[in-house]
Amino acid sequence: MIENQSDNIDNKEKDVSNQDNAPEDISSEQNSTNENDELTSQKKEAINTEELKNTISNNDARLKQLEKEHETLKNQYVRISADFDNFRKRQSRDQDDLKIQIVSKTLTAILPIVDNFERARQQLQPESEEAQALHRSYQGLYKQLVEVLKQQGVSPMRVVGQQFDPNLHEAVLREPSEESDEDFIIEELQRGYHLEGKVLRHALVKVSMGPGKQNSQQEVEKDTVEEDVNSEVNTSEDV
């Protein structure tokens, strides 16, 4: 009986001892769990930081690539825009040139008619009233032709007294002149015309050789004659 009671007391003491040690075990387990959680959290943070750095680096690289592509496309747009603008200007210029070529052919065919009217006006001297009336009628037609030419952008050249220019004039005759310097136009033989600032027809002109040219030519001929005479005289003496 006494032994049983002693055993019960020992068991109770063990239970009390176990109960006293239990909180320490629980606290140790909690600390271990907290440490593991902290390590896990640190690992996750490290992983997230690395991923963020990689993401930022990739985004920077992508941004640079997009900026490069944007610059390339911008340059292409500028070139295409410039090419199109040049094409538009060239197309407009070609159309204007074609228009002038077509108009030039038509107007060039009309110019001889205008020349005939001008010759008639200079040469005809109507005496009777009937002839004068006919002359006025012709002059009316001539003025209408000139007006049509003006409306089409045709303008006559003024060449007398101007220096000879092969781009504008065609020299038909050259002769000495005491009044004009060399290579200056002294007479218009056929009128020249401009069309929109371009030459529609060259003017046929007489050009001055300058003063003294005729005398120089005569002196050359005189010297040649004298040489021939002297040569004949020398030949006679030798005989």
From Swiss-Prot:
GO biological process: protein folding
Protein family (similarity comment): Belongs to the GrpE family.
Protein name: Protein GrpE
Disordered: annotated span: 1-56, 208-239
InterPro entries noted in UniProt: GrpE, GrpE_coiled_coil, GrpE_head
Origin species: Prochlorococcus marinus (strain MIT 9215)
Main location: cytoplasm
Ranges annotated as biased composition (Acidic residues): 224-239
A Pfam short name: GrpE
Subunit structure as annotated in this protein's UniProt entry: Homodimer.
Keywords: Chaperone, Cytoplasm, Stress response
Composition-biased stretches (Basic and acidic residues): 40-53
CC per GO annotation: cytoplasm
GO molecular function, one term: unfolded protein binding
Keyword Cytoplasm attributed: yes
Gene: grpE
SUPFAM superfamilies: Coiled-coil domain of nucleotide exchange factor GrpE, Head domain of nucleotide exchange factor GrpE
Function, as annotated: Participates actively in the response to hyperosmotic and heat shock by preventing the aggregation of stress-denatured proteins, in association with DnaK and GrpE. It is the nucleotide exchange factor for DnaK and may function as a thermosensor. Unfolded proteins bind initially to DnaJ; upon interaction with the DnaJ-bound protein, DnaK hydrolyzes its bound ATP, resulting in the formation of a stable complex. GrpE releases ADP from DnaK; ATP binding to DnaK triggers the release of the substrate protein, thus completing the reaction cycle.
UniProt xrefs under PANTHER family: GRPE PROTEIN (PTHR21237), GRPE PROTEIN HOMOLOG, MITOCHONDRIAL (PTHR21237:SF23)
Location of this chain's protein in the cell: Cytoplasm
